[in-house]
Structures are given as C-alpha cells and as structure tokens.
Amino acid sequence: MYMYEEERNNINNNQEGLRLEMAFPQHGFMFQQLHEDNAHHLPSPTSLPSCPPHLFYGGGGNYMMNRSMSFTGVSDHHHLTQKSPTTTNNMNDQDQVGEEDNLSDDGSHMMLGEKKKRLNLEQVRALEKSFELGNKLEPERKMQLAKALGLQPRQIAIWFQNRRARWKTKQLERDYDSLKKQFDVLKSDNDSLLAHNKKLHAELVALKKHDRKESAKIKREFAEASWSNNGSTENNHNNNSSDANHVSMIKDLFPSSIRSATATTTSTHIDHQIVQDQDQGFCNMFNGIDETTSASYWAWPDQQQQHHNHHQFN
C-alpha cells in the first residue's frame, strides 16, 4: 500500500514538471523568433544568462515575466521607429503639447521634478510695455521679443495669453464697479423720487378732503341763503298784497274823501300856477300894459273858476 502511494506521487510530480516546462519553455526557444526580427537590436540568445533549474519550480514565473516585459518594450520601440512620417509628425505635435503643458504660468519651462523658472524683473517689464502697446501678439513681434529677451517664442505666447486673461478679468471688475456705482446712484434717485411722490400723494389726498369739506360748506351756506331769500320775497309779496288790499278797501269805504284829496292836490297845483302868473303880471305892470291885457288879467278868476269846475266834472 505504501509503495502504491509513492508511485502515484512520483507520477503526479512528473506530470507537474511537464506542465511547468510547457508553461515556461527554455529561453533559447522562447526568444528565437524575437532574435530573428530584431537581430540588430537584441543580443544573441547565447549571451543571455541561463535560467537556473530551481526557478522553474517555485519562483521562476516572475523572473521570466519581467524578462518578457523588458524585451516586449524593446520590440515596441522597434515598431514605433518604423512607423510612417505622418504618425511621427503627430507624435511630435503631441510632444510639443506636452512640453507646453509643462510650462508655468509665466512662460518658464518646467521639466519633470524641476522647479519653476520665473522671468526676471527686466523681462517682465519689457513684456508689460509690449502688452500695453497691443494685447494681441503677432508672430513677428513674438519672435522679436523672444530674441530681445532671450526667451523661447512659446514662453512669450503663453505669457501674453495669461496676461490677456488677467487683463480681461480686471476689465470685467472695473466694468462691474462702474455699473454698480451707477446702479447705486440710480437707486438712490429712485428712492428719493418715490419718497417725494408719496409725500405729494399725501398732500393731494389732504387737499381733496379739504376741497370736499369746503364744497359741502359752500353748498350748505348757499342753501341757507336760498331759504332766507325765498322767505323775504314771500314776505314782501305778502306786504305788497296787503297794502293794495288796504287801499282798495279805503277807496270802497271813503270815495268822497279820495276825491277831496284829489281836488286838494289839484288846487295846490293851481295855486302854484297863480303865484307864477301874478309874478308875471306885476312885471308887466311896469311895461305899459294895455286895457285888454288888464281886462284879461282881471278876468282870470272866472276862467280859473271854469277850469276848476271842469276838473271836478272829470
């Protein structure tokens, strides 16, 4: 029974060894094709160090894998060198973009693990003066500045780009401040106008109330005056009517008295006329009046009596 188990273990070990040999062939066989393709790049297989047998059992995998990766990198480099010119140019452009990415904000070139190379004060002043002349960088001016300042054209372009971005930011800040000041002034004016409008509205409401009160007062006074005028007119009319009634009643009751009053009034008028005629008669006495005139003069009482009688009949 023990012998049987030992033989089975030996068989298993042999099978395991075969599998490992198939998985990790010898280095001569493994790199034969690679040697044929890259004869001028790779050393001969005989120059490679031999792989110890113990590496095939328990730890040889990592070693072979590392060697395989190293030679694979060499092969990739060989294939990249044999690509078309267009691909090479594209890669050069990408390299330039990568180099531009390594540039700092002020245009200085940064290598991997290298500190920023800042521009000196004179270079910055010269670039500032050039930027004041024009914020857009032309190719000719870029080359002139690069030669004059001892910088690369790419550094000049990046510095102008960053400086233009800062200038736009400052310009926006100035515009914002100016607009904010204008807004504050307009807001203040608007607030004052609103307050003045509110004050005027309050005054208008007060004037309307006062006007309504005055109108009501005037209407009330006018109504009272109308009532008083109507009352006085009616009283005057009543008084006039009563006076007329009284006169008519007196005429009806005393007609002879009224006629005697009328005759008295007429005689008074005649007496006044006689006095005037007497004055004229006395004046004519001294002017040589004749008998006819004197006769007519002395006959006046008869005529006066007739005239008096005529008025009585009327």
Curated annotation (Swiss-Prot):
Q: Which residues bind DNA?
A: 112-171
Where does the UniProt entry say this protein principally localizes? nucleus
A GO molecular function assigned to this protein is:
DNA-binding transcription factor activity, RNA polymerase II-specific
Classify the source by domain of life. Eukaryota
Q: What does this protein do?
A: Probable transcription factor.
Family per similarity comment: Belongs to the HD-ZIP homeobox family. Class I subfamily.
Could you tell me which PANTHER family the record lists for this protein?
Answer: HOMEOBOX-LEUCINE ZIPPER PROTEIN, HOMEOBOX-LEUCINE ZIPPER PROTEIN HAT7
Q: Please state what the protein is called.
A: Homeobox-leucine zipper protein HAT7
* Source organism of this protein record: Arabidopsis thaliana (Mouse-ear cress)
Instruction: Please spell out the taxonomic lineage of the organism that makes this protein.
Output: Eukaryota, Viridiplantae, Streptophyta, Embryophyta, Tracheophyta
Q: Which gene encodes it?
A: HAT7
